[in-house]
Amino acid sequence: MLEQQRNPADALTVSVLNSQSQVTNKPLRDSVKQALRNYLSQLDGQDVNELYELVLAEVEHPMLDMVMQYTRGNQTRAATMLGINRGTLRKKLKKYGMG
């Protein structure tokens, strides 16, 4: 029997309250998409610069914070978990005032 492959990103969900006051989970990517839709709709034709960096910082900072908590501050484990080298992790932690 073949086992169905799970996409690890499917576990990244956000709990939301629907119109019937029920809590449901939706993929993180849907929440990011909605946040961007809201942001872009408020621009009213204005040009925007560095949107990529803005969005990345909004996701990267809390991700680093949670991974460092999960690994109890072990940078080697955190870097492995994130799939980056330890030097890169240290730079990112410094960037966000976390290291």
Swiss-Prot record:
Activates ribosomal RNA transcription. Plays a direct role in upstream activation of rRNA promoters. Residues 75-94 bind DNA. Keywords: Activator, DNA-binding, Transcription, Transcription regulation. Belongs to the transcriptional regulatory Fis family. The keyword DNA-binding applies. The lineage of its organism: Bacteria, Pseudomonadati, Pseudomonadota, Gammaproteobacteria, Pasteurellales. One of its GO terms (molecular function) is DNA-binding transcription factor activity. GO terms for biological process: positive regulation of DNA-templated transcription. Homodimer. NCBIfam families: PRK00430.1. PANTHER family: DNA-BINDING PROTEIN FIS (PTHR47918:SF1). It comes from Pasteurella multocida (strain Pm70). This is DNA-binding protein Fis. It comes from the Bacteria.
